[in-house]
């Protein structure tokens, strides 16, 4: 613990908050290309394989991004748009791919939560 004299001379140092999405450079989204698309097993107690893409962003950062939803058409050299948001059971995955933008298709036939998965409005009968 500092003495009163030390506090008068130097003061207290403010704690710096760590930036969770440093790769995005304070942008809401970033564009990138996928050098690799794979699956990864999550932490205990979960077990379903998570679809993961390694993405080289336009600012030369390499990150892992989660591909949400059921099924995807992403492959090597696909262009994807990235947003923040971690995947709780996958260590090191701190961002998501945005469906329905660039080469990553939306989910066809999805009715609920369409805006999150880039799905088109279904035709009314």
Curated annotation (Swiss-Prot):
GO molecular function: structural constituent of ribosome
Cellular location(s): Mitochondrion
Pfam families: Ribosom_S12_S23
Composition bias, Basic and acidic residues: 10-23
GO biological process: translation
Region (Disordered) residue spans: 1-23, 104-125
One cellular component (GO) term of this entry: small ribosomal subunit
Keyword Transmembrane: no
InterPro entries for the chain: NA-bd_OB-fold, Ribosomal_uS12, Ribosomal_uS12_bac
Signal peptide annotation: none
Keywords annotated in UniProt: Mitochondrion, Ribonucleoprotein, Ribosomal protein
Keyword Ribosomal protein on entry: yes
Chain's role: Protein S12 is involved in the translation initiation step.
Membership in a protein family: Belongs to the universal ribosomal protein uS12 family.
NCBIfam families per the UniProt record, alphabetical: rpsL_bact (TIGR00981)
Name assigned to this protein: Small ribosomal subunit protein uS12m
């Amino acid at each position: 613990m500092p003495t009163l004299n030390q506090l008068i001379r130097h003061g207290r140092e403010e704690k710096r908050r760590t930036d969770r999405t440093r790769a995005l450079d304070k942008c809401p989204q970033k564009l990138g290309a996928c050098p690799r698309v794979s699956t990864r097993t999550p932490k205990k107690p979960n077990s379903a394989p998570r679809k993961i893409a390694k993405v080289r962003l336009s600012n030369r950062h390499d990150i892992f991004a989660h591909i949400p939803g059921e099924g995807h058409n992403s492959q090597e050299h696909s262009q994807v748009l990235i947003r923040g948001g971690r995947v709780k059971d996958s260590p090191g995955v701190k961002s998501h791919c945005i469906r329905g933008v660039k080469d990553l298709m939306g989910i066809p036939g999805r009715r609920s939560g369409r805006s999150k998965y880039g799905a088109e409005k279904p035709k009314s009968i």
